[in-house]
Amino acid sequence: MRPGAASIRTTGSVLAFLVPSAQCMRSAPAARFSTSPIRCKKDNNSNRGVSAVRGTGLRKRQTLSVLSKKGSGDQPPKPVPITEKVTGTPDHGLWDFFKDKKLIQTPVDESRHGRAWTVGELRNQDWDALHQLWWVCVKERNRLATEKIERARLDAGYGDQENKDRDTVVQETMKAILDTLSERHQAYMEAVELAKQDPSIDLSRTDGPQFVEPAYEGVTCRVAEYTLESFGHVGVGQHLLSEGWHIVTA
């Protein structure tokens, strides 16, 4: 029988035929193999992690002192207390986007409006009145669009139909203004074509009136001078006028 490993006494000398196996029993040196880079023991950049763009702020062990130097006597500034409430400009132009300075109108207030202007009513208005009415409609549509956006942002859930009906009436008025101006432009173009055929109108003239009143030729006017006492009979004056006489009282 082969003796066990425990019964073998360790001796300082190893037999010659056991030398190769004894070398294998020893711990063979292992080569280090790693794809990871060597980790640095210390970061030489003292400002690492402090970025004004990324806003990372201070490092853990970095402190920020606002105290002045010793002996200077300067104290840190103190914030000024707010004594008045900022209200803004009461007559600012942006308030026109909100009716009565309210964020949104109630459906009852939104539905309080009249009908649209008709073309027949706008024909009697001059250019300045049509110009003012047009920009009133533009401002009203801007106000309605602002209320629509605010109503969607607040998720109010009311007033959309009233807002749409009011906007439709404003658009009908603006369309009537455009139709009125189209009629006037068409009438102007037709008048220009007629003026080109009229010999008494010179459209190329820019230094004076383009219309020259023609002189009346071939018309004779007979003048008869009478005193008021000479008209004893009314029929005499009527007869003279019918004959082409021009009566001048002296």
From Swiss-Prot:
It comes from the Eukaryota. GO terms for biological process: mitochondrial translation. One of its GO terms (molecular function) is structural constituent of ribosome. Its main location: mitochondrion. Keywords: Mitochondrion, Ribonucleoprotein, Ribosomal protein, Transit peptide. Pfam families: MRP-L47. InterPro entries: MRP-L47_sf, Ribosomal_uL29_mit. It is found in: Mitochondrion. Belongs to the universal ribosomal protein uL29 family. This is Large ribosomal subunit protein uL29m. It comes from Phaeosphaeria nodorum (strain SN15 / ATCC MYA-4574 / FGSC 10173). The gene is MRPL4.
